[in-house]
Design a protein with these regions (language model features):
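Glycine-rich portal/gate segments that line the openings of hydrophobic small-molecule binding cavities
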Residues: 35-81, 87
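Hydrophobic ligand-binding cavity/cleft-lining segments
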Residues: 1-43
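Alpha-helical scaffold segments that form or flank carboxylate-/histidine-based iron centers
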Residues: 19, 53-57, 118-121
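Short, highly charged C-terminal tails/helix-capping segments
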Residues: 134-143
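Intrinsic-disorder/low-complexity, polar/charged segments enriched in Ser/Thr/Lys/Arg/Asp/Glu/Gln
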Residues: 10-14, 21, 51, 60, ...
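A short, structured loop/turn motif at beta-sheet edges
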Residues: 21-22, 66-71, 91-100
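Non-transmembrane alpha-helical segments in soluble domains
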Residues: 25, 127-130, 134
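Beta-strand/loop substructures that line and gate deep hydrophobic ligand-binding cavities in soluble
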Residues: 10, 81-128
Length: 143
């Protein structure tokens, strides 16, 4: 099944964090950790076919987990009610002293309503989220 529309505008952002790939993986796949940087209210079943729901104020997105490769790659589709769906993929690369986290968001083939403007908004959103992820990785909560 082809999820991404290769001709559609896309967003790619990355950041370096002072954390192991295992720590980053937890931040990407644990509801409590996601709430530290992605959105205040996250529900996630981190298995292929599982559901994801993200709420931040009046904004809500829901989707399906598509790829789970522990410690390396995590991907899902999500959409807001009445808007096109997009495919979000995180990859983790181990580096000396930390990890590189890359996120790519691409409209799916069913997302004919996506425009260059919505792509620019997505890019700004990921810039902010990755800054928050970096901060969350420095302040790992103690159980």
């Amino acid at each position: 099944m082809k999820l991404r529309d290769e001709k559609a505008p896309w967003v790619e952002r990355d950041t370096l964090v002072e954390a192991s790939p295992e720590e980053v993986w937890e931040a990407l796949t644990d509801e409590d950790r996601l709430e530290e940087w992605l959105a205040p209210d996250v529900e996630l079943d981190p298995v292929e076919g599982g559901e994801i729901a993200v709420r931040d104020g009046d904004e809500e997105r829901a989707g399906t987990v598509e790829t789970v490769e522990e410690g390396e790659r995590f991907a899902f589709t999500w959409s807001r009610p009445g808007e096109g769906e997009s495919f979000v993929e995180f990859t983790i690369e181990a580096l000396p002293g930390g990890s590189r986290v890359t996120v790519v968001e691409t409209p799916t083939q069913s997302a004919a309503t996506n425009t260059a403007g919505s792509t620019a908004m997505a890019a700004g959103g990921w810039d902010t989220r990755l800054i928050r992820l970096g901060r969350a990785m420095r302040f790992t909560p103690v159980a």
